[in-house]
C-alpha cells in the first residue's frame, strides 16, 4: 500500500497541497487537493473490461458539494443533499470538457470521476481546485490518459491580468475566464467579460495557459515519483480491406450528397446511400465476419473525412456556403401578444423562440450555495425539445446540456443588463429551441437581446453570438463562420463568441485536436467579430433600441422614499395598515429599511391610490393646516377624527360648531367626512382639531 505523500507548490497567491495515498485507497487513484482551505476529494475509477455491445466512451464526471464543507445544514425537509444544483452540473461539465479529448481514441472502458467539495473558503472557488485534482488523479492512476492538464482562472483588474483572483477581487474584475490545457495545447476556455476587445481576450488566454504550466510541472513530478503504469486495453482493429472497399464505394457516391444543401434532404440522401452501400457490402462479404455496425462506423468516418477534405480544398461547405458566409437570418419581434416581450430568431435551420417575463423582487431566485445566499434577478432558461431536430424523445427536467447552454447565453447578456436602480424588475428569459442545426445557444443570445428590447428592458447594447469551427490537417487549417451541426461534429474546434459592437461578453471554446496555435485563436476571434457585426446589422434593422414602454400586461413598479422612522406607521400594528392597504388597492408593497417603498400594480390608478395613501400616512401633521378627515369615534366630550390615513385627533365638543352643542351625535355621525383644522400638537403627539371657522360644504 502506498505511503501517504504530501506535495505542495505555490500557485499565484495561493498554495496548492496534493495529498495522495491517505483517503479512498480502493479507487484507481484518489487525490485530496487543497487551495487556501478550499479542499476537494477527487477519485477516479475505471473498469478493466468493456461492457458487451459498448460502442462509445462512457465517461461520467460528477462534481458534488457537501454543505458541511461550509459548516452549514442542507435545506429541505430531509436535511441532506439531493439532486445536483445548477452550479454542480455546470462544474461537472467544466471538468468533463478538457479531460474527455485526452483519453485514447477507441478507448471505451467505463470511467467515473467524482470530485467532492469537503471544505470551502468563500474566497476560493472550488472549480479550479477540482480540475487540478482530477488532472492529478487521472495522471497518477493506471487509467490510460494523455495528461496532465492545468487549470487557471484569469481576472482583469485595473488593466492587469490576475491569476486565480479571490471572490472579492473577481467582483471588481472585467473578466472571469477559466482555461484548461496541456503543456502544449489549450483544450477549453470558458469566459464572461465586460465588453473586452479581441486582443484583451487573447492576451488573457495566453496568460492563463502560461501560468497553468506550474500545475502541469508539479503533477508530472508526482507521476515520475508515484505514478502507476497504465493498464493495457484492446483497441478494436480496423478491417483494412473493408475500409478500402467502403472508401471506393462511398467516394463514387459522395458527389450525390453535395448536390443537396438543405439539411433534411442531405441527410435523407446520405441515409439512402449508406443503406445501399451496407446492402452491397453484406452481399459481398457473405462469409466474412462483418456486421452492419462496423460498416456504419467506417461509413461515418469516411463521411467526416470527405467533408473535411472538401472544406480544406476551398470547395463549398456542405450547405453551399463559403468559409465566412453567415446563414440567412429572419427576425420577428412581439409575436407572443400576452408575454411581456418576445422574439423569433431564425438563422438557417436554427430557430429560437424567446419570451421575457418581468416580475418583482419577490420573483428573484434565492440561491443557497456553499458561500452563502445570493439573489439572482436575471434568469435565463434554455429548452431543447426533441422535435427541434425532428426526433422523438423524453421531455422532462432540463438535462446537463440545456443547463450549460442556458448559462452560456446568460453570460453573454450579463455585461449589458441594467442594474436594480436602473430597472427594478426581476427578469426571466426562456429560449425555446424550435429548430436546430448548430449554434442554438448563440441563437438564444440573439433572440434574448431582441426580446429584451421588445420588453422595454434598457439593455446597454444589442448582443449577438456566433459559433466558429475549425478544420485542421497538419499545417493546413480553415476557420469556419456560423457552423452547422454536421460541421461541429466533424470539426476540431467549437468556438462560441458573443458580444456587442463594443466588445466581447462571453466566449466558450472546446478543442478536439492538438496543434491549435495562438495565431489560429486570433484568426477565429477576428472572424467571429466580423460575423457578429454582420448579425447585429440585421438585428438592428428590426429593433435598434429598447422600447420606451414596457408591456401593458407587465406589472408597473413605482418607488417612493419616506422617512425611515415612518416605516412603522406604514406597516401598522401586526401589519394591519399595510395589509389593508394592499387589499384595498390590489397592489404589492415592499418596504426596505432605508425608507424606499416599492409599489407594484397592473393598474396605474391603483398604484396612484396606494402612493397617495402612503404619502398621507407618512406625512407630518402641520399646525394650522386643514385636512379632510373621517369621524372614527364619538364620546360625550367630542369626536375623534382620523386624518392622513391613520392619524387621529380630537375635536372637542366646543370646537365642533360656532353654536353651542349639547350632544355630539346631534351634529356628527360615525364615518362622516369633515374638514378639520389642526390647532395644536402636544408633547405626547396628541392632536387637537377644530371644525370652527372651516367651511364644511366641500367635506
Swiss-Prot record:
Keywords for this protein: Cytoplasm, Magnesium, Metal-binding, Nucleotidyltransferase, RNA-binding, Transferase
Subcellular location, record wording: Cytoplasm
Cofactors (names): Mg(2+)
Any one Gene Ontology molecular-function term assigned to this protein's record: 3'-5'-RNA exonuclease activity
Keyword flag RNA-binding: yes
Gene Ontology cellular component list: cytosol
Residues annotated for Mg(2+) binding in this entry: 488, 494
GO BP: any one term: mRNA catabolic process
Main location: cytoplasm
Domain KH: 555-614
Domain of life per record: Bacteria
E.C. designation(s): 2.7.7.8
Reaction(s) catalysed by this chain's protein: RNA(n+1) + phosphate = RNA(n) + a ribonucleoside 5'-diphosphate
Statement: the UniProt record of this protein carries the keyword Nucleotide-binding: no
InterPro entries assigned: ExoRNase_PH_dom1, ExoRNase_PH_dom2, ExoRNase_PH_dom2_sf, KH_dom, KH_dom_type_1, KH_dom_type_1_sf, NA-bd_OB-fold, PNPase
Family annotation (CDD domains): KH-I_PNPase (cd02393), RNase_PH_PNPase_1 (cd11363), RNase_PH_PNPase_2 (cd11364), S1_PNPase (cd04472)
Residues covered by the S1 motif domain: 624-692
Matching Pfam families: KH_1 (PF00013), PNPase (PF03726), RNase_PH (PF01138), RNase_PH_C (PF03725), S1 (PF00575)
Family as reported in the entry's similarity comment: Belongs to the polyribonucleotide nucleotidyltransferase family.
Its job: Involved in mRNA degradation. Catalyzes the phosphorolysis of single-stranded polyribonucleotides processively in the 3'- to 5'-direction.
Subunit structure: Component of the RNA degradosome, which is a multiprotein complex involved in RNA processing and mRNA degradation.
Protein name: Polyribonucleotide nucleotidyltransferase
Amino acid at each position: 500500500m502506498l505511503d501517504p505523500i504530501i506535495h505542495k507548490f505555490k500557485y499565484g497567491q495561493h498554495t496548492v497541497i496534493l495529498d495522495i495515498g491517505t483517503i479512498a485507497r480502493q479507487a484507481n487513484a484518489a487525490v485530496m487537493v487543497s487551495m487556501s482551505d478550499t479542499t476537494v476529494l477527487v477519485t477516479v475509477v475505471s473498469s478493466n473490461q468493456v461492457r458487451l455491445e459498448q460502442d462509445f466512451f462512457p465517461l461520467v464526471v460528477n462534481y458534488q458539494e457537501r454543505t458541511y464543507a461550509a459548516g452549514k445544514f442542507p435545506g429541505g425537509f430531509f436535511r441532506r443533499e439531493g439532486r445536483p444544483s445548477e452550479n454542480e452540473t455546470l462544474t461537472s461539465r467544466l471538468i468533463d470538457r478538457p479531460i474527455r479529448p485526452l483519453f485514447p481514441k477507441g478507448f471505451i472502458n467505463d470511467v467515473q470521476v467524482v470530485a467532492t467539495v469537503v471544505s470551502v473558503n468563500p474566497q476560493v472557488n472550488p472549480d479550479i481546485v477540482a480540475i487540478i485534482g482530477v488532472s492529478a488523479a487521472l495522471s497518477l492512476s493506471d487509467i490510460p490518459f494523455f495528461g496532465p492538464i492545468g487549470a487557471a482562472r484569469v481576472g482583469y483588474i485595473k488593466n492587469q491580468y490576475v491569476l486565480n483572483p479571490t471572490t472579492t477581487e473577481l467582483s471588481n474584475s472585467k473578466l472571469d475566464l477559466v482555461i484548461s490545457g496541456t503543456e502544449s495545447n489549450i483544450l477549453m476556455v470558458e469566459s464572461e467579460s465586460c465588453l473586452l476587445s479581441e486582443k484583451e481576450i487573447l492576451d488573457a488566454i495566453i496568460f492563463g495557459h502560461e501560468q497553468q504550466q506550474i500545475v502541469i510541472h508539479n503533477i508530472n513530478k508526482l507521476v515520475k515519483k508515484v505514478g502507476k503504469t497504465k493498464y493495457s486495453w484492446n483497441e478494436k482493429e480496423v478491417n483494412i480491406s473493408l475500409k478500402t472497399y467502403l472508401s471506393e464505394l462511398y467516394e463514387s457516391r459522395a458527389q450525390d450528397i453535395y448536390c443537396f444543401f438543405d439539411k433534411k434532404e442531405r441527410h435523407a440522401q446520405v441515409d439512402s446511400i449508406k443503406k445501399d452501400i451496407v446492402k452491397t457490402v453484406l452481399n459481398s462479404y457473405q462469409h466474412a465476419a462483418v456486421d452492419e455496425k462496423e460498416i456504419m462506423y467506417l461509413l461515418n468516418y469516411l463521411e467526416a473525412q470527405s467533408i473535411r477534405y472538401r472544406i480544406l480544398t476551398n470547395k463549398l461547405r456542405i450547405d453551399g456556403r463559403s468559409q465566412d458566409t453567415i446563414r440567412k437570418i429572419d427576425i420577428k419581434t412581439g409575436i407572443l401578444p400576452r408575454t411581456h416581450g418576445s422574439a423569433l430568431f431564425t438563422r438557417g435551420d436554427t430557430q429560437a423562440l424567446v419570451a421575457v417575463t418581468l416580475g418583482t423582487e419577490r420573483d428573484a431566485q434565492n440561491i443557497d450555495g456553499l458561500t452563502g445566499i445570493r439573489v439572482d434577478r436575471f434568469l435565463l432558461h434554455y429548452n431543447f425539445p426533441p422535435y427541434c431536430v425532428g426526433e422523438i424523445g423524453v421531455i422532462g427536467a432540463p438535462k446537463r446540456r440545456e443547463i450549460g447552454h442556458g448559462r452560456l447565453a446568460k453570460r453573454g447578456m450579463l455585461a449589458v443588463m441594467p442594474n436594480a436602480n436602473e430597472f427594478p424588475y426581476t427578469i426571466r428569459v426562456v429560449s425555446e429551441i424550435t429548430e436546430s442545426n448548430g449554434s442554438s445557444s448563440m441563437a438564444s443570445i440573439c433572440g434574448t437581446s431582441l426580446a429584451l428590447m421588445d420588453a422595454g428592458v434598457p439593455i446597454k447594447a444589442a448582443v449577438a453570438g456566433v459559433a466558429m469551427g475549425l478544420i485542421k490537417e497538419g499545417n493546413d487549417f480553415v476557420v469556419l463562420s456560423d457552423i452547422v451541426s454536421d460541421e461541429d461534429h466533424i470539426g476540431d474546434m467549437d468556438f462560441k463568441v458573443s458580444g456587442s459592437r463594443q466588445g466581447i461578453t462571453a466566449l466558450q471554446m472546446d478543442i478536439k485536436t492538438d496543434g491549435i496555435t495562438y495565431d489560429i485563436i486570433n484568426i477565429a476571434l477576428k472572424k467571429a467579430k466580423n460575423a457578429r457585426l454582420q448579425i447585429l446589422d440585421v438585428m438592428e434593422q428590426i429593433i435598434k433600441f429598447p422600447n420606451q414602454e414596457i408591456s401593458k400586461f407587465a406589472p408597473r413598479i413605482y418607488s417612493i422614499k419616506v422617512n425611515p422612522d415612518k416605516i412603522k406607521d406604514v406597516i401598522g400594528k401586526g401589519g394591519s395598515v399595510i395589509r389593508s392597504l394592499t387589499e384595498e388597492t390590489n397592489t404589492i408593497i415592499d418596504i426596505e429599511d432605508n425608507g424606499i417603498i416599492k409599489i407594484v400594480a397592473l393598474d396605474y390608478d391603483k398604484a396612484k391610490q396606494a402612493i397617495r395613501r402612503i404619502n398621507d400616512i407618512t406625512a407630518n401633521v402641520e399646525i394650522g393646516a386643514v385636512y379632510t378627515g373621517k369621524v372614527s369615534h364619538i364620546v360625550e366630550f367630542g369626536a375623534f377624527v382620523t386624518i392622513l390615513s391613520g392619524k387621529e385627533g380630537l375635536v372637542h365638543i366646543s370646537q365642533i360648531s360656532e353654536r353651542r352643542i349639547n350632544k355630539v351625535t346631534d351634529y356628527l355621525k360615525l364615518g362622516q367626512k369633515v374638514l378639520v383644522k389642526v390647532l395644536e400638537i402636544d408633547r405626547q403627539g396628541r392632536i387637537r382639531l377644530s371644525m370652527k371657522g372651516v367651511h364644511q360644504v366641500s367635506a
